[in-house]
């Protein structure tokens, strides 16, 4: 491709998605390309690109690359969970077209609002009269540079596809999700959250497995749904894990404000549970959207585990009882002790059944298998235990029992005998009790059943009742531990009290958790059991019919109406014992009981599925043990009139006793209670065995209760009732109701049918004789009581009733026509309820539903009863207000929905609707009379309200009524009347009030009814009137939230309930353990959803009606909807209420709005619809007009509230689409849509409306905007927070939002110019609000957004170049954009402690703008925080620099008055006084921090102020005194010299404030470079140290990822006068002077590098680099950026001099440190090592000769080459070196830690004298001459007569004596508390009361004493008028 073609690019018609299939790495071969064009980059295989341009020859592409973060970025930038996670970044790259594979089928969604701004976008906003160019055009024309904001030269490139996954499917979303997880894995590892890190890794692999299976279509449809649900659940866990890592770090004051989770990674979003697609606003129900969000956010494993049952999973028929459960059981993995290799089971039988603690629930399933248990367990079929009653599950724990028995062979060689049988003299051995029978066939048995082990497990957790839907339809695995019976004590046990002894009592002991008599059999230790609940009869039958493995159905043990009940008897054997013999005295090992019957039709079995047997051998036990085995006896109907069971008892296999037991006698089955004892006789017909047994009969043929028999024989046809017969009937009926439920249940159908016949017969007889008889009432009363007894709380009888009802309805059974009779009796009782109410009435309320069913079923089509009178009687009853009757009213209301449903086939639906209206109207009237909605309620009243609204909910959900009510084909007035009345009933509980007591549970049912009406009833009239309810609902929301807060409902909880419950009380759902401290107020969420649904109706069904006023006018003729709840007109109060509601929506203290972003987006969209409905009203009724009087009527507070909530919604986190990650962005947009477009439209309309009637044509022509008014100005100036919100809104990446905000900002600026003639007030208003936006973390900028905003602002601004307004605009823009630039830069600084200094520096720049904007308090607060921080660290120099910086903000103005401030605490005073005070404190802290040079500089500034501004002589005296003290102290101060380092930062791991920049750092005294390395590595985590300058140059050329630091030592550059000669001065003074000069103006440093080619020091040339810093040291943060670098060459001699000076300075520092350590009595061991090493290296260096090598320059052969002056300087340097070396050697001798080192010291002295002999001699000679000269000068001064008073003056000032008035400083009492007095009183008093010698100075500052605590302590008094009075009087 030619160069010309390469520069020509053609845009594609759309963004094209592609993936690189080959890496393109241009920078590997040509790294310099990166400097030619930033689009050149290395692009690797797999890169995701979006092409937007192609070259002309189609060979090259330019595209966006989704640049994923590298691991180094996480390590470099992540320090805590608060830090912003590195995300995908768009980068424009160039690559060959052939390297990419395009996937054109993947559509890329581009949003028009992301477009780049252009002039065309702003033309509609500019006045047509405008004659000037835009700012953008002006800059473009006036500049020859290519300005980014100028006119585009080609078609702008499309925006980056932020919504690239908007139209992708669920499985396509898995890719970015996995990429996101990998980012989180890196981030969690980087911040040390290793537990979350490991969980994230597991999530990654789980999701990747699901992605693979879905992508490859490796699933069935059912599996696909399960995988999608699992993936949805895992995605939600990601958000929860991330949320759990969030910690509220206590950041220091100058840290960058952080908006937690800016990307929405913690966001919870609702998905379709079957497809996995995100739910949307347009398609899905809002109730589903919010409920799914709540379940995802609060529960574990949703939607994998269902939490709420669907509508069709509820009770299938509430009329006939709840759905029963069945339990599916499967046995696996019988385990034995590892010590046993083979348990050797013998004909093992396994018995399984269910029971509670007290009763057996099912028959047992028994199966006998071979000894090979590996195959035996596989052969055992699964067991289905059917029809477990719900009442049993609710009241008891359900246990699964497994019993293992084996059949073993026994030997019959050992006959039973007694070990020690006492025989009297009269008796013989023939009297032994053990005498076998002579029968040859039955006298012995060779096999017995022995109990091996048994186990019990509580399986209650598998029932949905206990754990909800999380366990429904899911099998649970249990490990069932097996135990055996320990019968060692049974031999000595003879008491009959313990029935649980031995094998038969083992199960009870295990249940009771008793260890007595329980052991472990190593042959059977445990068993694995799988248990699953099957709900409903149909599901159970489905399992049986579709299972691929055999399943046995096990019936119940009790009399169950759902099974075909065969006649049967259950026989259970208890304890068996020897009669009169202790078991321990016998050799009996086993007792076996066998039963049989001579009647061959009588059979025995364990359950009805087993093969029947003519006899049954029970398990063998030892004497005194319980057998505990139950069997079933069948063939009861074939028994003789008298029937017995034959009982045989074998002892050790020998038949020793037998007897017959009656089981039937005189045609009655004999039942034996538990514990009944029978004596079994021996062959000698004497009792030998005591046997306990229990026999229970289950059947209805025998043992019928006499009362039932008497009732069934009552005549029902052609009966003539006399008084005696009436009494007989009455007594019989009452006796019947006294029969036990168990007996009544067996004959329930017969009794019920006979009762109906009896009702008909008695009624007919009464009709013939007249109404005087009371028998019909008695019969009806007893009938109702019978129904109440049998049907109210009993499931079995309801099933019988159901069967009877079905037979009647199918005409299989003829039923007497008792309908009129039943209705008449009930009507009569309800009519009389106001005067008398009996138990019969209560029974009717309990059973009215069943009575109505009987009435409907028994009525003939031509004789349908008239229900109207009956309905009216019910209405009367419900009007009663008596508290006792309310319980019966509740029962009646509960039955209404099912009752009406039953009547739908026999009554007109319209009649039922009228009845319902009347019923609820009666309830409503009673509630209003009793003021139920405005006072606390009793428990009964609450139950009543809940029942009423639950009834209403069920009613509108009943299919027949719903079909009628939802029919929209015709307009039916009754239908609309019912709906309008329903809305009134629902809205009444919401009636607002200040002290309103809301009944939350009732309101939740109200909400359920309300949402059902909104969702299912689509009448236009209804829906448009629902919109009129919005103001009322908003008001209700405000009051309800206030009540919830007052009632403490807005607190974190560990449980929650489903939204819109179907019944109260609700089922509580536990919160996931990952989730902490979430507040969810369900009732508020429900009401918010209702409001959202209605706003959705307004926007979708009535889009052409854009205001409340239009909707209200549309509903004028809707007479049914004109109650007080509906708005008839909109008022200011309505608008205030709506804005308050929107504000509370986003206050979000009632649900986790920052996490449930989908719900927040929904509330945002609904809020904007609400506000848009109010817009027309506000504009029409609250806009200004040309007259000033009308402007006064404008409610600016209303405008402020309205605009505030618009911006609140628009600036919410859920509205920041580009800030969100890819999936949250997609989810939010599906719900919220383009919110900002609506917001921008409303804001534009409002802004223009505020200028209604005000149009400035001049401004329109010159500046492009003419609609300007004082109202606009007042709105934003009096509510300046709106300016902040406008700026935040402007920086959203949305063209409409930005351009409208720019219009408003430009208009606001024009208003400022129009009113003030200056833009400085605009700066004062904008800058603080921008800072406020930054502080709260909402003003988050990047380079592109700032550039975009500037472009839009320049397109909007129109100012003629020659206009006086132009310079003001430029100044305004300079301040505004400068501040925004700082905000932009500060967000590039990572939020880690290591970058605090960079952040502080940026904050200081930021506060300079705030100072200019007349907002110094923020700056003051920051400086004060810094000061306190440094004082606490005892870093007095940094504290002083902070105060100096603060003092610089004040002018030397003594005529103004400043208000008192809190930070720092300063009184009311002038600017001069405040600045003076701060400078003095700064100087004091400089002195305390050993920086007297800085203190001198401060005092010199004060001298200038005192001398030139206010002529304060006292101040001058004080300052000069301080300066004199400092100069004096400088001559004797011992202080340590810090080390300085040049530090360079390279790599993209550093922010721009550090990257590729160099600084000079002030280190610690004598700090080694390795120590600086360690400190920097600790501060800048993850950094690498670079050691060579060559590496630094390479890194600067090609910056890599990561962090790289280079450190080099630098030395301060001294600037000493050439006239300064140290030879005549003491070396100690010379050292102090040198330190003074060095620290006086320290901002220049140097280091050097050797040049190659030198052979020795005399020809060694070096390059010296001099670094100039921005600030003078000491400086804030102990560092300053290098702003200038100069390079120069040093000759060999200059290098020698420089090296000597450096060494001298180093030795001076060591000397000072030693002196200071000795003075402070510190540890000298480490110091001695450092001193010894340095002296040794100086005197006699082992390598290169050390310092002595520089003497070569003084040799005659070499000295000729250099000038005499330079050689003189070298000589002086050697002299000074000798002096300091001598002192150091003296210190070395003093510091010797032991005498053993004295020889080493002597050697050093000797070497010193040898190597520096010439210098020592010269220095000694010079020193002697200097001493003689000085002595002569002092003598001359003493005897001089020129100044006789000098000595007196000296003594008079500095030698003050007690009692004299010389130089006395007088302080008045009133002057001692001013700010200046504080300083003078502290400093001058001490100065004048002590001598001026250095003894008055301590080590920490100018004077001794405690430091001032003015900043951290109390505030001084503010008496500024006091003057210090000095009286310097001297005596003669």
UniProtKB/Swiss-Prot annotation:
<dbReference type="GO" id="GO:0005739">
    <property type="term" value="C:mitochondrion"/>
</dbReference>
<dbReference type="GO" id="GO:0035556">
    <property type="term" value="P:intracellular signal transduction"/>
</dbReference>
<keyword id="KW-0496">Mitochondrion</keyword>
<dbReference type="InterPro" id="IPR026791">
    <property type="entry name" value="DOCK"/>
</dbReference>
<feature type="compositionally biased region" description="Basic and acidic residues">
    <location>
        <begin position="1922"/>
        <end position="1932"/>
    </location>
</feature>
<comment type="function">
    <text>Forms a transiant heterodimeric complex with LMO1, that acts as a guanine nucleotide exchange factor exchange factor (GEF) for the small GTPase RHO5. DCK1, LMO1 and RHO5 relocate to mitochondria upon oxidative stress and trigger cell death. The DCK1/LMO1/RHO5 signaling module mediates mitochondrial turnover under nitrogen starvation conditions via mitophagy. The DCK1/LMO1/RHO5 signaling module plays also a function in cell wall integrity signaling.</text>
</comment>
<dbReference type="InterPro" id="IPR046773">
    <property type="entry name" value="DOCKER_Lobe_C"/>
</dbReference>
<dbReference type="GO" id="GO:0031267">
    <property type="term" value="F:small GTPase binding"/>
</dbReference>
<comment type="similarity">
    <text>Belongs to the DOCK family.</text>
</comment>
<dbReference type="InterPro" id="IPR043161">
    <property type="entry name" value="DOCK_C_lobe_A"/>
</dbReference>
<comment type="subunit">
    <text>Forms an active heterodimer with LMO1.</text>
</comment>
<dbReference type="InterPro" id="IPR043162">
    <property type="entry name" value="DOCK_C_lobe_C"/>
</dbReference>
<dbReference type="GO" id="GO:0005886">
    <property type="term" value="C:plasma membrane"/>
</dbReference>
<protein>
    <recommendedName>
        <fullName>DOCK-like protein 1</fullName>
    </recommendedName>
</protein>
<keyword id="KW-0963">Cytoplasm</keyword>
<dbReference type="GO" id="GO:0005737">
    <property type="term" value="C:cytoplasm"/>
</dbReference>
<dbReference type="GO" id="GO:0000422">
    <property type="term" value="P:autophagy of mitochondrion"/>
</dbReference>
<dbReference type="Pfam" id="PF20421">
    <property type="entry name" value="DHR-2_Lobe_C"/>
</dbReference>
<dbReference type="InterPro" id="IPR027357">
    <property type="entry name" value="DOCKER_dom"/>
</dbReference>
<feature type="domain" description="DOCKER">
    <location>
        <begin position="1410"/>
        <end position="1824"/>
    </location>
</feature>
<feature type="region of interest" description="Disordered">
    <location>
        <begin position="1908"/>
        <end position="1932"/>
    </location>
</feature>
<feature type="compositionally biased region" description="Polar residues">
    <location>
        <begin position="1908"/>
        <end position="1921"/>
    </location>
</feature>
<dbReference type="GO" id="GO:0007264">
    <property type="term" value="P:small GTPase-mediated signal transduction"/>
</dbReference>
<dbReference type="GO" id="GO:0005085">
    <property type="term" value="F:guanyl-nucleotide exchange factor activity"/>
</dbReference>
<dbReference type="Pfam" id="PF25338">
    <property type="entry name" value="C2_DCK_4th"/>
</dbReference>
